């Protein structure tokens, strides 16, 4: 099953076979030499050109390829290692370890293109996924097997939230996580690895990187590599897995680059005509089955802050919750810098999370919204000009703002304060009490960077004694 190269167009390679036609998505291998160095390259068949000619996408740089070089058809798709041996390791798109450790000899591999779970296999019951992060659990709760969009600019704490979620899933749910770096900066991928090592969560996570400097084929398919590893834990081990994709926009962007090279006519804003279908193909595989679930957190870059751009717009259709990080909140020193009024969740309704949770969440949002509306008056006239009722609202809102902050386990190394996991029960008790006015007598500084309301009371007591 050998063929030869007839044309190289950047990351796209045309191959002709004599008596064999490889299937779409089949892997092809090329072994060649560049400046005396042996190299191997994997291609994936993307289109049939007629006759026994195929157009394939390269999963690595194509420098050094020449016409008439021998290409071998694998007879199967790209397969990547799965199972517990992938934890704590970094992989590239074709499943090779790239962390300079002992190369992995996998005992089990799965193809990266797989069918989404059928209707019979899917689980339809909606269950809340407790993260242990107060602001998320209270105001924009995640659902098991749901998809969450994490929106935020540079330096507001997306990575820290991702690491904390990985930590909490590992320690409280005894679960595993998979991180797919799609079109990531190499530096960020490197930082994440070492931060996870320091944070002690590396042995519970598998990392797959297709970085910014790699060809579009690698950046696009890396999402499937990570997803396949997560699917194994869901289907074979019956676990609830967390799947992180950073950044889902780059998945769409690399698809657009590939589409142009394959000669397809572009659609709106130069994107591929198959954008919605490609996004659906990936997102539909992220689902809850009767065995286990994959809950995904996807960082979404919004080009030029335009939410109507086809790429982010195609992601929105699939999301169950959005966690929006706000720089203004980060500047106040409140971490995690989640915007309590901008973040949304599909399961924030009395039928899904219960009457009590819903009432407390909407009550908190009303107080914060009222405080936001009063800011102009306070700026012009000062606090003293407000009515007694409004003064009370401002006091409570400031306490709520401070109480939405929380020390993280993975940030212990930097902050020096031990991390806190707050159960939903404790979160509701604390915020419910603030709304009822139970803690009106406690100074607002006692609410800053603590876990449960019990700690607030202890902190207030210590402040009083000192």
Curated annotation (Swiss-Prot):
It catalyses: ATP + H2O + 4 H(+)(in) = ADP + phosphate + 5 H(+)(out). GO terms for cellular component: plasma membrane; proton-transporting ATP synthase complex. PROSITE patterns: ATPASE_ALPHA_BETA. The keyword Nucleotide-binding applies. It holds the Pfam family ATP-synt_ab_N. It is found in: Cell inner membrane. Its main location: membrane. It is a peripheral membrane protein. Gene3D superfamilies: 2.40.10.170, Bovine Mitochondrial F1-atpase, Atp Synthase Beta Chain, Chain D, domain 3, P-loop containing nucleotide triphosphate hydrolases. Keywords: ATP synthesis, ATP-binding, Cell inner membrane, Cell membrane, CF(1), Hydrogen ion transport, Ion transport, Membrane, Nucleotide-binding, Translocase, Transport. Disulfide bonds: none annotated. InterPro entries: AAA+_ATPase (IPR003593), ATP-synt_VA_C (IPR055190), ATP_synth_F1_bsu (IPR005722), ATPase_a/bsu_AS (IPR020003), ATPase_alpha/beta_chains (IPR050053), ATPase_F1/V1/A1_a/bsu_N (IPR004100), ATPase_F1/V1/A1_a/bsu_N_sf (IPR036121), ATPase_F1/V1/A1_a/bsu_nucl-bd (IPR000194). Its EC number is 7.1.2.2. It is an enzyme of class 7 (translocase). ATP binds at residues 152-159. One of its GO terms (molecular function) is ATP binding. Produces ATP from ADP in the presence of a proton gradient across the membrane. The catalytic sites are hosted primarily by the beta subunits. HAMAP family: ATP_synth_beta_bact (MF_01347). F-type ATPases have 2 components, CF(1) - the catalytic core - and CF(0) - the membrane proton channel. CF(1) has five subunits: alpha(3), beta(3), gamma(1), delta(1), epsilon(1). CF(0) has three main subunits: a(1), b(2) and c(9-12). The alpha and beta chains form an alternating ring which encloses part of the gamma chain. CF(1) is attached to CF(0) by a central stalk formed by the gamma and epsilon chains, while a peripheral stalk is formed by the delta and b chains. Belongs to the ATPase alpha/beta chains family. This is ATP synthase subunit beta. It comes from Helicobacter pylori (strain HPAG1). The lineage of its organism: Bacteria, Pseudomonadati, Campylobacterota, Epsilonproteobacteria, Campylobacterales.
